[in-house]
Amino acid sequence: MTTNRKDEHILYALEQKSSYNSFDEVELIHSSLPLYNLDEIDLSTEFAGRKWDFPFYINAMTGGSNKGREINQKLAQVAETCGILFVTGSYSAALKNPTDDSFSVKSSHPNLLLGTNIGLDKPVELGLQTVEEMNPVLLQVHVNVMQELLMPEGERKFRSWQSHLADYSKQIPVPIVLKEVGFGMDAKTIERAYEFGVRTVDLSGRGGTSFAYIENRRSGQRDYLNQWGQSTMQALLNAQEWKDKVELLVSGGVRNPLDMIKCLVFGAKAVGLSRTVLELVETYTVEEVIGIVQGWKADLRLIMCSLNCATIADLQKVDYLLYGKLKEANDQMKKA
C-alpha cells in the first residue's frame, strides 16, 4: 500500500498544474544606480545552527518505493555536486520496512548535506531512530493534518501532536524544522511551536504541490478542497511578526531564482524547491540538471546586484509592490 501510494504521489504531483501563483503578485523595485560589483555578491545564509553557502535547497519529496529510490539518488547527486542541502521524503516508510533502502543516499554521496523528514504523528522515539539511521544535519518534522484527513488510510487522532512537538524540540540531537506540506503555516502555529522551543519553520504554502489535490485525485472525492490553505506569499506575509524570533524557510510553488529572491525580501532565510526540481530530474539528465541549478546561483547574484544587495540580509531593505489577492489581504491585515 505504501509503495503504491508513494508512486501515486509522484505521478499526481507531476501532472498537477496550479492556476494561481502568489509570487506573480509581488513586484520588486529595481535600482538603476548599482553599488556593488557582481563578484561582491554573497549568497551565504544561516539557519538550523549552521552557515550555508546558498539560500536554497531541495525539499522533501519522496522515498519508500523503487521509483522514489531512483529519484532520491538523482537528487542527491545534484545536491552534492552543487553544494546544497537535500532533504529526503518522509522516513516513515523505512521505519515500517527495515529493508527499504530508498533513502540510503549518503553512502554513494559522502559529501552530501543531507536532511530527512518524519511526520509529527510519530513519537519522538521514532524520530531518534530516524536520526540514528540517517545521520542528517537536520530533521524536518512535518505537519499535514488536511492531507491525513483526506487520505482514507490517514491519521484521525491528533491530540498527541503538540506533546510530540515538545518532545522533538527537547530530545532530537540535531536541529529540527517544523514543516508544513503545502497548506501554508499560520502565525498561531508558529507561536505555539516557538513556545515548545522550535526556532526554524518551513511555511510551505499553496501554489506548488498540493497534497489535497493528490489525495483527492487518489480517492476521486472532494475536489472542492483542492485549493485548501494559504498561498506561499500569503503565509510569509502572515508570518512577518515572527521573522526576528523564528528562522523562516519558505517553499511551495517556487519556480525560479526570482521567486527565491521574493521570499528572501520578506525575511526568509532560505527557500525550498520540490516539484520544480522533480520535473527537472524527470525531464533531463542529472548532468543537465546540475548545470541548471548552478545557473540559478549565477542568476541569484545578478538579481541581487540589480537590487543593490550584497548580502541576503540586504534584501529585506528592497522596496516592493503587491497586487491582486496579496494586496487585498495585506490591506486587511493592516486594518485588523
From Swiss-Prot:
Residues annotated for Mg(2+) binding in this entry: E148
Keywords (A to Z) from UniProt: Cytoplasm, Flavoprotein, FMN, Isomerase, Isoprene biosynthesis, Magnesium, Metal-binding, NADP
EC numbers, comma separated: 5.3.3.2
Names of the cofactor(s): FMN; NADPH; Mg(2+)
Single GO term (MF): isopentenyl-diphosphate delta-isomerase activity
Pfam families xref list: FMN_dh
Subcellular location: Cytoplasm
Record's keyword annotation contains Manganese: no
Major place of residence: cytoplasm
Family annotation (Gene3D superfamilies): Aldolase class I (3.20.20.70)
One GO term (biological process): isoprenoid biosynthetic process
Binding site for substrate: R5, K6, Q147
SUPFAM superfamilies with a match to the protein in the record: FMN-linked oxidoreductases
Binding site for FMN: A60, M61, T62, S90, N117, K179, S204, T209, G253, V254, R255, S274, R275
Catalytic activity: isopentenyl diphosphate = dimethylallyl diphosphate
One cellular component (GO) term of this entry: cytoplasm
Family recorded in the similarity comment: Belongs to the IPP isomerase type 2 family.
Subunit structure: Homooctamer. Dimer of tetramers.
Function summary: Involved in the biosynthesis of isoprenoids. Catalyzes the 1,3-allylic rearrangement of the homoallylic substrate isopentenyl (IPP) to its allylic isomer, dimethylallyl diphosphate (DMAPP).
Protein name: Isopentenyl-diphosphate delta-isomerase
Source organism of this protein record: Streptococcus pneumoniae serotype 2 (strain D39 / NCTC 7466)
Gene that encodes the chain: fni
